[in-house]
């Protein structure tokens, strides 16, 4: 069954859009830190007949008949997730990381309770108490940030804020923090003020699974994550706990609390991705992700572009463009013109608005999936520096784009199987 061929015949307009997107991915350097390239096996699971099945409830406790096979798939996804993160409980049904976080809030909090997370402009996330998100509208959100000198977590300040505000829930885990997170220190603070501790490891889940970043499971009451990004699976969410009995309370907050029927085709794809992440090759991949990020950071620093915190411990490289008198909005446009995809991002203590910003966030997960090594990322760093430091030079712009296309041809995105099915 060639689904894409059927799509071409049934809806050539959508088929052509998909082909165009595939071409864009092949001919651009994907440096958005939250993106990656799922395997063909993961994509096949997503596009399977499982999309036809309703399965409200949990395995063996469904509200619909005919769930014997999706039960087995979901149970396998749960088993693999628990093994991957050394957890005793898992729920694989959340449609996204935001949905996973919402389910946790529903279980542990009441409207008006105080939650404490990192300020969005310092590297936090919308769902950690931003005033534009339900987490900031329904709860009393207080925020901590990073040290102004080091751009790293300041646990003395975090403790002071916690002691003063007495949050019901403390959130650690970020969207633009390039350093290792000390979960044990957060646990100590949470215990001191009597708070629940939640880790949102959406960005670093693959590194945690590979044991290249400390695991929050032993220290946190609950852990949430997405299943794409460094984990390289389908777009979706996941909730994990060390305490199986405590974890059961989140089952009801996922369904019927915040969702209806689970997406069993996505859960199958999650199971495939978890299986891939349990293989030794995935550890090698994760190691390369970090090596590549360090090379990218050092290359840019050597060209006179500041990096927030002076480097990175994970896949994220956050440029502070105030060092070259440029905004993130302009930098994002400049690199996009030479087929590099990134995103403007606030930096700690940013004087610019979130629509302009002083930063550019880069990530190495996607290109590492394509096979990029340290030498390739050194070239990526040089291309970015050449473009940003010469914004008005059309010749350098043209040369940068040629160098990007050379790298794209050197590291093709997918093997011939996908190529043949889309043509």
From Swiss-Prot:
Q: Which InterPro entries match?
A: PyrdxlP-dep_Trfase, PyrdxlP-dep_Trfase_major, PyrdxlP-dep_Trfase_small, Ser_HO-MeTrfase, Ser_HO-MeTrfase-like, Ser_HO-MeTrfase_PLP_BS, SHMT-like_dom
User: What PROSITE patterns does the entry give?
Assistant: SHMT
- What is an example of a GO molecular function annotated in this UniProt entry? glycine hydroxymethyltransferase activity
EC identifiers of the protein: 2.1.2.1
Q: Which GO terms describe its biological process?
A: glycine biosynthetic process from serine; tetrahydrofolate interconversion
- Modified-residue entries (N6-(pyridoxal phosphate)lysine), positions: 229
Q: Where in the cell is it found?
A: Cytoplasm
Pathway involvement of the protein, from the record: One-carbon metabolism; tetrahydrofolate interconversion; Amino-acid biosynthesis; glycine biosynthesis; glycine from L-serine: step 1/1
Record's protein name = Serine hydroxymethyltransferase
- Name the source organism: Prochlorococcus marinus (strain MIT 9301)
Organism phylogeny: Bacteria, Bacillati, Cyanobacteriota, Cyanophyceae, Synechococcales
Gene designation per UniProt: glyA
């Amino acid at each position: 069954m060639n689904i894409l061929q059927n799509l071409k015949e049934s809806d050539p307009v959508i088929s052509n859009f998909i082909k165009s997107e595939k071409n864009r991915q092949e001919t651009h350097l994907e440096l958005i830190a939250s993106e990656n390239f799922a395997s063909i096996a993961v994509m096949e699971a997503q596009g399977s007949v499982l999309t036809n099945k309703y399965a409200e409830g949990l395995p063996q406790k469904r509200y619909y008949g005919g769930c014997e096979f999706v039960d087995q798939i979901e149970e396998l996804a749960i088993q693999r997730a628990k093994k991957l993160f050394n957890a005793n409980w898992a729920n694989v049904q959340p449609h996204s990381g935001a949905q996973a976080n919402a389910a946790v809030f529903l279980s542990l909090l009441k409207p008006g309770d105080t939650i404490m997370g990192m300020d969005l402009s310092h590297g936090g996330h919308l769902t950690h108490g931003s005033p534009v998100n339900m987490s900031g509208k329904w709860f009393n959100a207080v925020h901590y940030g990073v040290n102004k000198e080091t751009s790293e977590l300041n646990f003395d300040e975090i403790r002071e804020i916690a002691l003063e505000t007495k949050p019901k829930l403390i959130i650690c885990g970020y969207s633009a923090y390039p350093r290792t997170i000390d979960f044990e220190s957060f646990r100590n603070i949470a215990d001191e003020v009597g708070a629940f501790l939640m880790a949102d490891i959406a960005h670093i889940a693959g590194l945690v699974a590979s044991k290249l970043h400390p695991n929050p499971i032993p220290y946190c009451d609950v852990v949430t994550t997405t299943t794409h990004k460094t984990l390289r699976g389908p777009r979706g969410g996941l909730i994990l706990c060390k305490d199986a009995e405590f974890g059961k309370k989140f089952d009801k907050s996922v369904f019927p609390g915040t969702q209806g029927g689970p997406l069993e085709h996505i859960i199958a794809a999650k199971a495939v991705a978890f299986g891939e992440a349990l293989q030794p090759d995935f550890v090698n991949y994760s190691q390369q992700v970090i090596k590549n990020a360090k090379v990218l950071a050092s290359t840019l620093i050597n060209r006179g572009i500041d990096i927030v915190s002076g480097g990175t411990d994970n896949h994220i490289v956050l440029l502070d463009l105030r060092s070259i008198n440029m905004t993130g909005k302009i930098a994002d446009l400049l690199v996009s013109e030479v087929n590099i995809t990134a995103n403007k991002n606030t930096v700690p203590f940013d004087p610019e608005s979130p629509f302009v910003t002083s930063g550019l966030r880069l990530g190495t997960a996607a290109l590492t999936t394509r096979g990029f090594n340290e030498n390739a990322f050194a070239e990526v760093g040089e291309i970015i520096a050449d473009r940003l430091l010469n914004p008005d030079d059309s010749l350098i712009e043209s040369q940068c784009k040629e160098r990007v296309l050379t790298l794209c041809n050197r590291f093709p995105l997918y093997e011939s199987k996908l190529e043949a099915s889309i043509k």
